Amino acid sequence: MDLPRLYVPATLANLGSGFDALGVALDLYLEVEAHPAPEDAFLYEGEGHVEGTDNLIHEGYRAGMRALGLEPFPLRVRAFNPIPLARGMGSSSAALVAGVALADRLSGGRLGREGVFRVAAGLEGHPDNVAPAVFGGFVAALSDPPLAIPLPRPEGVRFVLAVPPYEVPTPLAREALPREVPLEDAIYNLARSALWPAALSSGKLEALREACRDRLHQPHRAPLMPGVLEAIEGALEAGALAAFVGGAGPTLAALARAGEEAPVIRALSAYRGPEGRTLVLGIGEGYFWKET
């Protein structure tokens, strides 16, 4: 049987202070078409180059089927991916969520959205990209136990993304982190991560300027992304409500009020570089299906 087309959003993890705990979906979507076939097949268009049936969509599909106690049957998958690869915008999470969502759909919804989150988070290892890809908007998430809670979604805001032309592989970014951190730095981040749900719930978005600040990961990864800390400060000085590295980077994300993006775009142009690109995106929905 042919399935409706599946859409899974790009995501930003960490939001500065909420390392491995907070994330947000963007309105830029991986598109997937799939149907049972005599043998596995994978057709890919879009960012980067991905081929073969040993891909993350098929991996997520197989994991979802096995979580249901079902033997995966061959699946022909066609994917169009506009999400930049290895740039900190959740391309891997989108693919894994897509695969698990396919298994859920083909099983008649036996996993449910919560089950899709649990299986995909188990594969990804970090829930802060998976949770917004599943539930949309801003989300707070844990991996052990697997738990995700959507946060209020502000109106009238947009993300300005400065996407440099180079990649920062997640394993390399993880290696840059210290094994231990000072207690005062942990407290610094804990206090500011609590500001995210407080500011979103109260509508006091000016507090996000402080909520996005971080001492646990961005300063340690900065040598992998030349000029990133200065660019964050430049975006805030240009009027951004918040600015932070997306996931492991190198994408720098700045949240701005709609209509006030232009000075933020200018402030981030040097960091993006002449071969990079700027994206302006709204807050995205969790994965959804649409008849073609």
UniProtKB/Swiss-Prot annotation:
Catalyzes the ATP-dependent phosphorylation of L-homoserine to L-homoserine phosphate. SUPFAM superfamilies: GHMP Kinase, C-terminal domain (SSF55060), Ribosomal protein S5 domain 2-like (SSF54211). It comes from the Bacteria. The keyword ATP-binding applies. Its EC number is 2.7.1.39. InterPro entries: GHMP_kinase_C_dom, GHMP_kinase_C_sf, GHMP_kinase_N_dom, GHMP_knse_ATP-bd_CS, Homoserine_kinase, Ribosomal_Su5_D2-typ_SF, Ribsml_uS5_D2-typ_fold_subgr. One of its GO terms (cellular component) is cytoplasm. GO terms for molecular function: ATP binding; homoserine kinase activity. It comes from Thermus thermophilus (strain ATCC BAA-163 / DSM 7039 / HB27). This is Homoserine kinase. Keywords: Amino-acid biosynthesis, ATP-binding, Cytoplasm, Kinase, Nucleotide-binding, Threonine biosynthesis, Transferase. Pathway: Amino-acid biosynthesis; L-threonine biosynthesis; L-threonine from L-aspartate: step 4/5. The keyword Nucleus does not apply. It is found in: Cytoplasm. The gene is thrB. ATP binds at residues 84-94. Coiled coil: none annotated. It catalyses: L-homoserine + ATP = O-phospho-L-homoserine + ADP + H(+).
